[in-house]
A protein has these predicted regions:
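A preference for well-ordered globular domain cores
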Residues: 1-78
Length: 78
């Protein structure tokens, strides 16, 4: 029974991990790399940032922090 719980927990964690990782890179994600690139392009052209970079950076860091937490949990589960 305990193995079933660990299996279910691993599956849930892996699903969350995949979602978070995809969110950082997907071109449809509200925290995706594409937004960082758009801010960079605007700055290179001397234009105003199209997005709030502080908020975007904080959201992206929160996702990365959660990714690390999940990876550590998965290591503990074996």
């Amino acid at each position: 029974m305990n193995e079933d719980k660990n299996f279910d927990k691993r599956n849930a964690l892996n699903a969350e991990l995949a979602s978070l990782m995809s969110g950082l890179s997907a071109n449809t994600s509200p925290i995706g790399d594409w937004k960082v690139i758009k801010v960079y392009e605007a700055r290179m052209l001397g234009k105003e940032d199209p997005y709030d970079m502080e908020q975007l950076s904080a959201q992206r860091q929160a996702a990365r922090d959660r990714i690390i937490e999940i990876q550590n949990e998965l290591k503990k589960l074996g």
